[in-house]
Amino acid sequence: MATCIWLRSCGARRLGSTFPGCRLRPRAGGLVPASGPAPGPAQLRCYAGGLAGLSAALLRTDSFVGGRWLPAAATFPVQDPASGAALGMVADCGVREARAAVRAAYEAFCRWREVSAKERSSLLRKWYNLMIQNKDDLARIITAESGKPLKEAHGEILYSAFFLEWFSEEARRVYGDIIYTPAKDRRALVLKQPXGVAAVITPWNFPSAMITRKVGAALAAGCTVVVKPAEDTPFSALALAELASQAGIPSGVYNVIPCSRKNAKEVGEAICTDPLVSKISFTGSTTTGKILLHHAANSVKRVSMELGGLAPFIVFDSANVDQAVAGAMASKFRNTGQTCVCSNQFLVQRGIHDAFVKAFAEAMKKNLRVGNGFEEGTTQGPLINEKAVEKVEKQVNDAVSKGATVVTGGKRHQLGKNFFEPTLLCNVTQDMLCTHEETFGPLAPVIKFDTEEEAIAIANAADVGLAGYFYSQDPAQIWRVAEQLEVGMVGVNEGLISSVECPFGGVKQSGLGREGSKYGIDEYLELKYVCYGGL
């Protein structure tokens, strides 16, 4: 069984001086925080202190396949992004484990698809109830492995659980059709049937919600799943597995195979090319999505892709400045700018530009506090790793070298290598990296524009189209712009648009299909036409 590296006999000696703040001790079935405060500067302590008192059953480190917790031949470390300290060692699954998980899921599918919609609904509801009962522990796991501020982590757990609740209800609403044909002696039926085993590959920025948004729909439809969570945040996926087991979800219906970054490519390829897999659902970068699409093409598998974005945030002269700033703060700085629907470029009309920039800068200075995600008052945690920080830093330096002005922020934060100051740039032009590369960090570049047509042209120039936002008090303009923006989701005078009841997805290279809402379950259902003759 994989254990916390701090207390593995050889690991403690090797890593003790490198990660002095991590003080977890192993207990059968998971990791348990050691007693006593973690040493070191308060702002850089390992998140182990925030895990004190956590249910040992939720801190799993092995893979979950066929209803059993299984070790792998190797393990990999999961790190606290705030300090770099290791939280624990997790099973590093390879191709062999991936194929075993697919087979377990396929065997379970042969039984699960026969389970009544009412029973599937009941089991999903039990899973939801367990998430709500354990919401505090689940939130702390998210903060520990991703750095997300605890308040936001609590919000994610509720959002995550609501997908299970929603799809528990949708499970009983999978209806077919009866079609009357021109021939009097025939009747046509349209059945909706589960597609089969779904390979689910999820990101680190929402390590719980991105799983339940996919898995809730899949299980409601009668599919089974193999989840490959992001290597940075496997603990959330494994905690969900424990709760699924407690809820009575049958063995093999929900499987989790964590793996290291080194093994991620081959494991992803293995589950996406396995002939027993019928469906692939992926949330992540457009680059990786294209690779998975290539794998799916060889066997023509059904695919759902939620990929990168370059969300424009447009502020027209008629906008209410205070409302626009509030929306900008919510859209840009949630999860320290690490969301796929995060505003990436701010297009502000000339007449309101100066007032907006001034108010935006003041709001950032007043309301944003960088720190450890477990500390009360923190609104901006660390970025997931130093590579993410380097990307933000590169974009800022590129913009400044080409004439942009730093209004506030602009550099790494003194707290540590994975922290970056919330940054506002003005005098930004379209030749700068930050206007055509997804940042995934706390950088807000402002471009000044003159006409509505100019703003639409800039926004639609991107080859991706996930989300877009704009602020206006002109009713005619609102209709025009909402219809003309080439994105899958539009926020009109609103910076937070995600909801379990509404379809989530993009156009162009931002993906295929929709998740959540009444449409989400259709991604896991096949239509079958049955013709009855001789009547």
Curated annotation (Swiss-Prot):
Keywords: Acetylation, Disulfide bond, Mitochondrion, NAD, Oxidoreductase, Phosphoprotein, Transit peptide. GO terms for molecular function: identical protein binding; succinate-semialdehyde dehydrogenase (NAD+) activity. One of its GO terms (cellular component) is mitochondrion. It is an enzyme of class 1 (oxidoreductase). The modification Phosphoserine is found at S499. NAD(+) binds at R213, K228, P229, A230, E231, G284, S285, T286, T287, T288, G289. Redox-regulated. Inhibited under oxydizing conditions. It is found in: Mitochondrion. Pathway: Amino-acid degradation; 4-aminobutanoate degradation. The modification N6-acetyllysine is found at K126, K265, K365, K411. It catalyses: succinate semialdehyde + NAD(+) + H2O = succinate + NADH + 2 H(+). InterPro entries: Ald_DH/histidinol_DH, Ald_DH_C, Ald_DH_CS_CYS, Ald_DH_CS_GLU, Ald_DH_N, Aldehyde_DH_dom, Aldehyde_DH_Superfamily, Succ_semiAld_DH. Disulfide bonds join C340-C342. Substrate binds at R213, R334, S498. SUPFAM superfamilies: ALDH-like. Its EC number is 1.2.1.24. Residues 1-47 form a transit peptide. The modification N6-succinyllysine is found at K126, K135, K184, K265, K402. The active site is at E306, C340. Transmembrane segments: none annotated. The keyword Mitochondrion applies. Gene3D superfamilies: Aldehyde Dehydrogenase, Chain A, domain 1, Aldehyde Dehydrogenase, Chain A, domain 2. Belongs to the aldehyde dehydrogenase family. Catalyzes one step in the degradation of the inhibitory neurotransmitter gamma-aminobutyric acid (GABA). This is Succinate-semialdehyde dehydrogenase, mitochondrial. The lineage of its organism: Eukaryota, Metazoa, Chordata, Craniata, Vertebrata. The gene is ALDH5A1.
